[in-house]
Amino acid sequence: MVQLGLVIAQFDKSGSLIAEMAEAAREAAAGREATVVEEVAVPGAYDTPLAADRLARRSDVDAVAVVGAVVEGDTDHDQVIADAAAQGLTDVSLDRDTPVTLGITGPGMSRDEAGARVGYGARAVESAIDLAENLG
């Protein structure tokens, strides 16, 4: 059975979007009989690499799934945040030799578009489980 770490980027002023993504991630894990051994909530997507690294260091974590959303604002800030998070998570995965999957939606999307993509939480978990099983 695969044991997962789950990182949840909380930057969602209404709260429901991220809560739905996290719940989709938990349901996907349960559906595959994987165990989420720890969840770490962080303020935003930019903060996810550090939390993913802490989880990837643990001997009881086979893979880490990261969920969150980067919604478009009035500047290019969303692009900068999304790029930094994606690169940071890739670095963690390679440095720790542990699957770290990206379930952060965006950038360049509206709140409505983000809401339509809550299933990415489940996709991140599915990918994490597949990688942990295939790379064993």
Question: Regions from the language model: what does each represent?
Answer:
Residues M1-Q3, N134-L135:
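Haloarchaeal acidic low-complexity proteome signature biased toward cell-envelope/secretome components but also
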Residues V2-A41:
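Glycine-rich phosphate/diphosphate-binding loop of Rossmann-like nucleotide-binding domains
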Residues A9-K13, V42, G68-V70, I104-G108:
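Short, ordered loop/turn segments at secondary-structure junctions
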Residues S16, E20, A24, P43-D47, ...:
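Conserved active-site and cofactor/substrate-binding residues in soluble primary-metabolism enzymes
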Residues R26, D53-A56, T90, I129:
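Generic structural signal for well-ordered alpha-helical scaffold segments
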Residues G31-R32, R58, D95:
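Alpha-helix C-cap/termination motif
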Residues V37, D78, A86-G136:
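C-terminal binding/interaction regions
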Residues D47, A51-G88:
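Glycine-rich phosphate-binding loop
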